[in-house]
């Protein structure tokens, strides 16, 4: 994930910062506890494409 791209992307729901998870290939919104998938290097930022984060 390009660092410059990560700096300008925001959660489409709360407009908060996203964190890149290299292991899962996802962008994480910690506020909403949602994960946005990355397919072939392209973040899928559609609210319907999210998965809820499970607290560990």
From Swiss-Prot:
InterPro entries: Trm112-like. Disulfide bonds: none annotated. This is UPF0434 protein CbuK_1382. Pfam families: Trm112p. HAMAP family: UPF0434. It comes from the Bacteria. GO terms for cellular component: cytosol. Belongs to the UPF0434 family. It comes from Coxiella burnetii (strain CbuK_Q154) (Coxiella burnetii (strain Q154)). The lineage of its organism: Bacteria, Pseudomonadati, Pseudomonadota, Gammaproteobacteria, Legionellales.
């Amino acid at each position: 994930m390009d660092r410059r791209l990560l700096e300008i992307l925001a959660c489409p729901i709360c407009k908060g910062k996203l964190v890149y998870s290299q292991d899962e290939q996802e962008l994480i919104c910690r506020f909403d506890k949602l994960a946005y998938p990355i397919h072939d290097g392209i973040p899928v930022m559609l609210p319907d494409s999210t998965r809820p984060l499970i607290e560990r």
